[in-house]
């Protein structure tokens, strides 16, 4: 009987800890929403809140017009653990801070360790934006051999034209696969469809008329109260239809 009670207490404690963690992760997502980050979209997986799906749209600098998908993996004890979240791109991305083998982004230069209550995911995403906006500035003051991709760093410093050519190759490859079948059946995976006038035209017109926010509740109601991971891009372009 005593063993059964101990097991029940442990289960209850684990459940409470899990619920508390879920609330903390939800709070992180709400903070990201309130920051209104431009050109970057993320959403937690439907089945695992420790895995997030994201897409980065380059809007300036060398990476302008890039469309890079990435995944964020949160530590098991996030945000209480000092371990850092992991950002992994789904394709080749040449950048001094991106490992050419694992496609993982090194965030340790900005976040030596995760400080619960001080560091937040929106700051991590702002850092991602910053290093792509100005890659040269992002490596200033850092020894080349301490960067994830020292070859990319050397190229950026000594042969910018070749570096830009490789970036353009990455951008083309990312665009070529933007409409690929999703690698997962997770309903929160961010999906892009080619523009269809009969399906997406009315939405585009509402956005142009500035009525998208007013119609949002009815759209969610039609989906059973849940927003979907679906997005649309205009034909011939690789920009999501949004108010921005």
Swiss-Prot record:
PROSITE patterns named in the record: UBC_2 (PS50127)
SMART domains: UBCc
Sequence ranges assigned to domain UBC core in this UniProt record: 20-176
Protein name stated in the entry: Protein crossbronx
Pfam families, per the entry: UQ_con
Family: Belongs to the ubiquitin-conjugating enzyme family. FTS subfamily.
Name of encoding gene: cbx
PANTHER family with a match to the protein in the record: UBIQUITIN-CONJUGATING ENZYME E2
Organism: Drosophila yakuba
Biological process annotations from GO: defense response to bacterium; sperm individualization
